[in-house]
Regions:
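A feature for loop-to-transmembrane-helix boundaries and adjacent hydrophobic helices
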Residues: 1-329
Length: 329
C-alpha cells in the first residue's frame, strides 16, 4: 500500500563534531521558521516607515515568552505525560522532562498567548503600534507555522485517525499517541501535511486581502486568527490527541481553535468600527522614528537655499530670499 514514510529516530537529532550534545531537528526547524518570519516581518514594517531592525527588539521579548507559553499550554493539557511517580521535574536534561522543549511538545495557542504578551512589552519599549506589528507579522507567522510543521513530521507527532488513503502516514509502533489495539502497519492521516498546505494557502489569502482592501489596525491579524482557527478546528476534530481535557465531549484544542475564530471576528468588527481609515504612522504619537536619510536630505535642501540666496546677494532666511527662492516660485 502506498504511504508516506516517517523519518527514523536517527533523523530526530543531528550530531555535532567536537560537541557532546546534539541538535534536535525539531528545534532547528522551529528556528528556521522564526528567522524567516522575522525577515519578512521586518521587510513589511520597513515599507511602512518603521525603523529597520525594530522587529529584532520586539522578538527579543516575544520569542522567549512564546516558547514558554507553548510549553506551558502543552504541559497543562497533557499532565500525565509529565507528572507521575518518580518524575524528576527539576532536571532539564532528563528525557520527558517538562523543560525538555527540544523533544517537541509545544502548543501554538499557548505560543500565541505568550508571544502576544511579549509583543505588547516590545511595542511599549520601541513605541511601535501593537496592531501595526501584529498585521505585519500575520502572514509571516502563518508561513513560519507551515515550516514548523516539518518538525512535527520528524518527531512523528500531529497525526490523525487511521486511513487507507495513498498518502497515509507511517508511525512507529512504539509511539505513545497511538491508541491501544490498532494493528501494526496502520496508516494515519498526515495532519502536519494538511496544516502545512492550509497555512501556505492562508499566506496568499491574507496578503491578497490586505492589498485588495487596505486592511490595517489589526484587521490583517484578525483574518489570520479566523483562517488559522477555522482550519485548525477541523484538523483537531480528526486528530489522535492524547490531551486529557474535554468539555461537552470536545477536546480543549478544538475549543481553543473556536476561540481564535471568535476573537478574530471581534477584533475585525471592533477595529473596523473604531478605525475606518488608515493608520497615520506605524508608531504611537510622540514615539515616531525619524529616518536619518530624510534628515540629510532636508539639510541638503537648506544648504541649496542658502547658496541660491547668496548668489542673488540676499541674506539667507530673509523675506526677499524666500520670495526669490525657486521653491516658492
Amino acid at each position: 500500500m502506498a504511504s508516506i514514510p516517517s523519518p527514523g529516530p536517527e533523523w530526530a537529532q543531528i550530531p555535532l563534531p567536537f560537541w557532546p550534545y546534539r541538535i534536535q531537528m525539531y528545534a532547528l526547524i522551529i528556528l528556521v521558521g522564526i528567522v524567516v518570519a522575522a525577515m519578512w516581518t521586518s521587510r513589511r514594517l520597513t515599507k511602512q516607515g518603521a525603523e529597520p531592525g525594530v522587529v529584532l527588539d520586539i522578538l527579543l521579548c516575544a520569542v522567549p515568552l512564546g516558547i514558554v507559553g507553548a510549553r506551558f499550554y502543552h504541559v497543562a493539557t497533557h499532565p500525565k505525560d509529565f507528572f507521575y511517580p518518580g518524575a524528576n521535574l527539576f532536571n532539564p536534561f532528563e528525557p520527558g522532562s517538562i523543560w525538555a522543549i527540544w523533544e517537541g511538545g509545544g502548543a501554538i495557542f499557548g505560543a500565541l498567548i505568550g508571544g502576544a504578551i511579549g509583543v505588547l512589552i516590545g511595542c511599549r519599549w520601541t513605541g511601535l503600534r501593537f496592531w501595526t506589528f501584529a498585521d505585519a507579522l500575520a502572514p509571516a507567522l502563518l508561513l513560519a507555522q507551515a515550516i514548523g510543521r516539518l518538525g512535527n513530521y520528524f518527531n512523528q507527532e500531529l497525526f490523525g485517525l487511521p486511513t487507507d488513503l495513498p498518502w497515509g502516514l507511517q508511525i512507529d509502533a512504539g509511539n505513545k499517541a497511538i491508541p491501544v489495539g490498532l494493528p501494526d502497519g496502520t496508516l494515519f492521516q498526515p495532519l502536519f501535511l494538511y496544516e502545512m498546505i492550509w497555512n501556505i494557502i492562508g499566506v496568499f489569502v491574507i496578503v491578497w486581502l490586505q492589498r485588495r482592501f487596505r486592511l490595517q489596525w489589526g484587521k490583517v491579524f484578525a483574518v489570520y486568527l479566523i483562517w488559522y482557527g477555522a482550519g485548525r478546528s477541523y484538523l483537531e476534530s480528526i486528530r489522535i490527541d492524547p490531551s486529557e481535557f474535554t468539555f461537552l465531549g470536545i477536546p480543549s484544542n478544538v475549543w481553543a481553535a473556536f476561540g481564535a475564530v471568535v476573537l478574530g471576528l471581534i477584533i475585525f468588527f471592533v477595529q473596523s468600527s473604531r478605525h475606518p481609515g488608515l493608520e497615520p504612522s506605524p508608531y504611537r504619537p510622540g514615539r515616531e522614528w525619524v529616518n536619518p536619510d530624510a534628515e540629510v536630505d532636508s539639510d541638503d535642501t537648506d544648504l541649496e537655499d542658502e547658496d541660491a540666496a547668496d548668489a542673488d546677494g540676499v541674506p539667507a532666511g530673509s523675506a526677499s530670499a524666500k520670495a526669490t527662492s525657486p521653491t516658492n516660485g
